[in-house]
């Protein structure tokens, strides 16, 4: 079974409805925002409640544990997201309103995200760049990218990011 979050899949609908409901569920949002690692997210009651809802919507019980860890990372990050931006995540990182030609996320910081040695480092790095993007990302895109994190997603991000031109001397 391929894990896919979109508006047509059960798990995509549950995730999007949950995220939209976070505005009114300030306690759950605060608990998730305080989590400093993927493990800390996975141990929170709000994550566990959502995980049970996702299982009911089609998230397989036998899903590999690394998928569950990646889901926890996505949920922790989504608690920081305030706006659903339909653009691809890397595109959002490279296009910043009011910054002229400068990207929201610098080239160096973007490369560091791509080179994250493990999921916790990626989680921390993404949590730090969310304010640079005004807390607006593609909700379902972020979940998909994290659950499927690997070379294919990294390459897609590299192709989507609008690398700034170097000034000519």
Name each model feature, range by range.
Residues 2, 7-169:
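Basic, alpha-helical nucleic-acid-binding regions used in initiation and control of genome expression
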